[in-house]
UniProtKB/Swiss-Prot annotation:
It is found in: Cytoplasm. This is SsrA-binding protein. Residues 130-154 are annotated as: Disordered. It comes from Synechococcus elongatus (strain ATCC 33912 / PCC 7942 / FACHB-805). Residues 133-154 have a biased composition (Basic and acidic residues).
């Protein structure tokens, strides 16, 4: 899954694009411990239930499960669900604060990847989809599949 430019996607939150209408994306760094980096490089990360909050001018990532590293002892290992600090420029954070305070907007992690050796997280500013929006998305996806099948047969 290596893309050009030294980017290797380690984990993707595909469910977020179904549950949220993503309005804007941000690339952020993440503050990690050594064993967390090793686990992430091994692909042992789950972004599904994650979300980010802005507190005291800092962005924090919650509910991201990074499995403990297999080779490390329990003493040196990390807490799998600990809150992790995201690294962003102050201007980006100020911009986020204004947008997150709007009704119904939330920050969700979309993707975790390696970029030139550094672990990065793509955050999406999203609005939760209603049930009928999800059904519409599913209907559109099914129509696309049907069209592709028809083209393939012809």
């Amino acid at each position: 899954m290596a893309d050009s430019g030294g980017i290797k996607v380690l984990s993707e939150n595909r469910q977020a694009r179904f549950q949220y209408e993503i309005l804007e994306t941000f690339e952020t760094g993440i503050e990690l411990l050594g064993t967390e980096v090793k686990s992430i490089r091994a692909g042992k990360v789950n972004l599904r239930d994650g979300f980010a909050l802005v507190r005291n001018g800092e962005v924090w990532l919650h509910n991201i499960h990074i499995s403990p590293h297999q080779q490390a002892s329990a003493y040196y290992n990390h807490d799998p669900l600990r809150t992790r600090k995201l690294l962003m420029h102050r201007e980006e954070i100020r911009k986020l604060i204004g947008k997150v305070e709007q009704k119904g907007l939330t920050l969700v992690p979309l993707k975790m990847y390696l970029k030139q050796g550094w672990v990065k997280v793509t955050l999406g500013l999203g609005r939760g989809k209603k049930l009928h929006d999800k059904r519409e998305t599913e209907r559109r996806r099914q129509d696309q599949r049907d069209i592709q099948r028809a083209i393939k047969r012809a």
